[in-house]
Amino acid sequence: SPDWPGITFPGGHVERGESFVDAVIREVKEETGLTISKPQLCGIKDWYDDEDYRYVVLFYKTEHFTGELQSSDEGKVWWEDFENLSHLKVATEDMSDMLRVFLEEDLSEFFYYKDGEDWSYQLK
């Protein structure tokens, strides 16, 4: 997708009346063709915009799925070995640290903040 010129996670929005878990299941199905179950909340990414509105992205992961990968209008999908990710183009420069929130038990938050005019982040 032109909006995400590189590897990124499946994702999207929560529809009115939809739970977070149901949104994760729906978005993964729409973008990958996989039917997942038992998604577990494993972290958040959050920030405030210039008008002090807070944005929160929820990270979920699961090992429970059925089906075959199918690319969609959102982009091409494929399985990739974790060790190869550092050699591939990723959609955002912070992808390796986002992955740490998914994988490291002692991390649960990826917090962006303004440091003067620049954006910085902390892993917590």
Question: Where do the language-model regions lie?
Answer:
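NUDIX/MutT-family hydrolases
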Residues: 70-102, 122-123
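Short loop segments at secondary-structure junctions
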Residues: 1, 62-68, 82-84
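Active-site-adjacent beta-strand/loop module that shapes the phosphate/pyrophosphate-binding cleft
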Residues: 46-68, 100-101, 105-106
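Charged phosphate-binding loop/patch that engages nucleotide di/tri-phosphates or the phosphate backbone
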Residues: 101-124
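N-terminal strand-loop-strand
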Residues: 1-9, 35-36, 40, 62
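Conserved Nudix-box catalytic region and its N-terminal flanking loop in Nudix hydrolases
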Residues: 1-29, 117-124
